[in-house]
């Protein structure tokens, strides 16, 4: 068996996000990384191969983000993301972008500058913890993954366990991913991620899932 891997550098462009997932501790600082900050992170990652761009979904619905983008000559946050993808390529790192739910034309734009894209399915069923998170609608997430397949974009996805789903929900969610992979052949990685309670979130007192299960 041959196991391959690539070192990556984590680039959290912003923690502004339209979703309010009950387990998430990502939205802390309400900040945006500047181009200079991104460049510094990329330059420090001299031994990395991949730049992992992550950020909150649809960040540009917030007025403060719109203002920040306008001051720098960008119309949308996706425009800024693509510019940072281009910077990464110029500095010799392969971009991988986790952008949340995307339209087909947005995937096309990202495809040009990314080695791969990613979106965790999390669960293929509706859950209480996503009640205030329109971007976690499983139908919309599945549609994004399928559209990436139609566009032949290498893709990473996976499930998040311990967030209120039943055992058969996990099995069903993995089956959904397997079916998409069979149909389009673009899924390169499937992550099985465990829920970890985070202080200050509605689910801070939930027990994490048993690793043996």
Task: Give the ranges of each region predicted by the language model.
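Short, solvent-exposed polar/charged micro-motifs at secondary-structure junctions
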Residues: 13-17, 107-108, 200-202
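Canonical Radical SAM [4Fe-4S] cluster-binding loop centered on the CxxxCxxC motif
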Residues: 3-37, 62
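Receiver (REC) domain switch-region micro-motif
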Residues: 5, 117, 190
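A structural micro-motif
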Residues: 3, 93, 153, 185-188
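Conserved Radical SAM active-site core
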Residues: 29-158, 163-172, 176-179
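Short loop/turn motifs enriched for small/polar and acidic residues
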Residues: 8-10, 14, 54-56, 100, ...
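Auxiliary Fe-S-binding modules of radical SAM enzymes
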Residues: 91, 171-213
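Short secondary-structure boundary segments
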Residues: 1-6, 55-56, 60-67, 131, ...
């Amino acid at each position: 068996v041959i196991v391959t891997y690539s070192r990556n550098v984590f680039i959290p462009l912003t923690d502004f996000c339209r979703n309010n997932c009950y387990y998430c501790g990502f939205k802390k600082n309400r900040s945006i990384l500047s181009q200079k900050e991104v460049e510094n992170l990329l330059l420090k990652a001299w031994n990395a191969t991949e730049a992992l761009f992550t950020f909150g979904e649809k960040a540009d619905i917030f007025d403060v983000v719109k203002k920040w983008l306008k001051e720098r000559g960008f119309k949308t946050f996706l425009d800024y993301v693509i510019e940072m993808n281009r910077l990464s390529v110029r500095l010799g790192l392969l971009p991988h972008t986790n952008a949340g739910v995307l339209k087909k034309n947005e995937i096309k734009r990202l495809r040009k500058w990314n080695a791969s894209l990613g979106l965790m399915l999390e669960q293929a069923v509706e859950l209480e913890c996503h009640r205030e998170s329109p971007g976690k609608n499983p139908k919309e997430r599945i549609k994004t993954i399928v559209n990436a397949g139609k566009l032949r974009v290498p893709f990473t996805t996976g499930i998040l366990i311990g967030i209120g789903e039943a055992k058969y929900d996990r099995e069903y969610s993995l089956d959904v991913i397997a079916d998409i992979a069979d149909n389009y052949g673009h899924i390169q990685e499937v992550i099985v991620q465990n829920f970890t309670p985070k202080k200050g979130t509605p689910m801070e007192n939930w027990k994490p899932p048993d690793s043996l299960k």
